[in-house]
A protein has these predicted regions:
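A compositional/biophysical signature of low hydrophobicity enriched in polar/charged and small residues
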Residues: 1-78
């Protein structure tokens, strides 16, 4: 069973398109789309464990130029 998360991303003005393209290129990212509202990009990612997710996805996302804030929302089964 894999760990899945949605990551909501705020960007600098005019950077949502380039951030979306950069995020989409990261291994483990299953979808990323520009949106309107308080966040500019919403992406979904998955990895084998939370540790793998942190190393392979989250660290790379947070290093992308133009990102000002992220909010990570783990997917749960209720």
């Amino acid at each position: 069973m894999s760990i899945q998360v949605y990551i909501l991303i705020q960007t600098e003005v005019g950077k949502s398109s380039s951030v979306t393209k950069s995020v989409t290129a990261i291994a483990g990212v299953t979808i990323a789309e520009s949106v309107t509202g308080p966040y500019d990009v919403i992406m979904r990612a998955e990895a084998a464990s939370m540790e793998d997710l942190g190393k392979s996805v989250l660290a790379k996302v947070q290093a992308i130029p133009g990102i000002t804030r992220t909010l990570t929302c783990p997917v749960t089964s209720l």
